């Protein structure tokens, strides 16, 4: 019988499952090398914690790791039901809030190691968390893709810790009672990008689609389709970072100015950035709340101990 101890939280409605104990030893390398070991040798642990019957397609997993740098508070590897994420904004907020809940960190700024670089996260007195993300940038502006049923769709390609295709002019109603249509549209766009060889830098896959609309309570509202075809309940930290990079590139948002990004369910992140040459360094602030603490059991007699794979 294998066991995995977890602590679940949600950030703006989007869940994070922090893995505390039970995964194999991944060595002492950096987070990217440990992610590679996990992916190539022990991926069944990811599947067990993310896939049904113990997980679902909305969950983002965060494996808590001992950091390489002794000054860092934690290392983390992010994953979901389809594979691995370079960075996760809402997940980092969830991680920091969870560490505070466990009494492992106090109010202040903490260094967090991720597979795509180190980030700074600040736990505030009001228990909100600010994440100073990895450098973000717009890779290409106004890229056209031919999408079945919808014709030409134009969007920007940007990096915010993951690769995004950001669409402002889409003709879709961005509302919580239109989720099926938004999902179908965004998924069709993603398939078209793949089919037409439209990628991020160095051929990296664009696995997030982000649609924007106006909002009465924020500067913008978004719908973000994640790699596993689930929509992000939060405003998406890496997606908001990609948005900030595009706004900065267009001269529509000055360094230090606040941008309020709402999600499809109305939760909000507050974002700003610093200019760093051709890149921007986004800071995303949000709140996370604990939702469950549990031990997962993987019984050797259970045919679905390592997840249901369809």
Curated annotation (Swiss-Prot):
Its EC number is 5.1.1.8. The keyword Isomerase applies. It is an enzyme of class 5 (isomerase). Pfam families: Pro_racemase. The keyword Isomerase applies. The active site is at 88 (proton acceptor), 236 (proton donor). Substrate binds at residues 89-90, 208, 232, 237-238. This is 4-hydroxyproline 2-epimerase. It comes from Acinetobacter baumannii (strain ATCC 17978 / DSM 105126 / CIP 53.77 / LMG 1025 / NCDC KC755 / 5377). The lineage of its organism: Bacteria, Pseudomonadati, Pseudomonadota, Gammaproteobacteria, Moraxellales.
């Amino acid at each position: 019988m294998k066991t995995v101890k977890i602590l679940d939280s949600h950030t703006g409605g989007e869940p994070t499952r922090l893995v505390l104990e039970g995964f194999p030893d991944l060595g002492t390398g950096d987070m990217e090398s440990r992610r590679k070991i996990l992916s190539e040798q022990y991926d069944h642990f990811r599947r067990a914690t993310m896939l049904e019957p113990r997980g679902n397609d909305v969950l983002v997993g965060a494996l808590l790791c001992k950091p390489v740098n002794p000054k860092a508070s934690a290392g983390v590897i992010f994953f979901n039901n389809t594979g691995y994420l370079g960075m996760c904004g809402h997940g980092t907020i969830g991680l920091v809030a969870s560490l505070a809940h466990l009494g492992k960190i106090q109010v202040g700024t903490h260094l967090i190691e991720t597979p795509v670089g180190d980030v700074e996260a600040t736990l505030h007195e009001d228990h909100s968390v600010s994440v100073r993300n990895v450098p973000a940038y717009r890779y290409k502006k106004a890229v056209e893709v031919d999408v079945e049923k919808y014709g030409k769709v134009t969007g920007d390609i940007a990096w915010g810790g993951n690769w995004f295709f950001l669409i402002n002019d889409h003709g879709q109603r961005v509302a919580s009672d239109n989720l099926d249509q938004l999902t179908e549209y965004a998924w069709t766009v993603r398939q078209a990008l793949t089919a037409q060889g439209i990628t991020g830098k160095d051929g990296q896959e664009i696995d997030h689609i982000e649609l924007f609309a106006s909002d009465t309570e924020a500067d913008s509202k978004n719908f973000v389709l994640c790699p596993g075809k689930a929509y992000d309940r939060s405003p998406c930290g890496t997606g908001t970072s990609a948005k900030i990079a595009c706004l900065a590139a267009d001269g529509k948002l000055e360094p230090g100015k606040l941008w309020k990004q709402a999600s499809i369910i109305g939760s909000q992140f507050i974002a700003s950035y610093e200019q760093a040459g051709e890149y921007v360094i986004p800071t995303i602030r949000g709140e996370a709340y604990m939702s469950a603490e549990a031990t997962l059991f993987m019984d050797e007699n259970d045919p679905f101990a390592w997840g249901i794979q369809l």
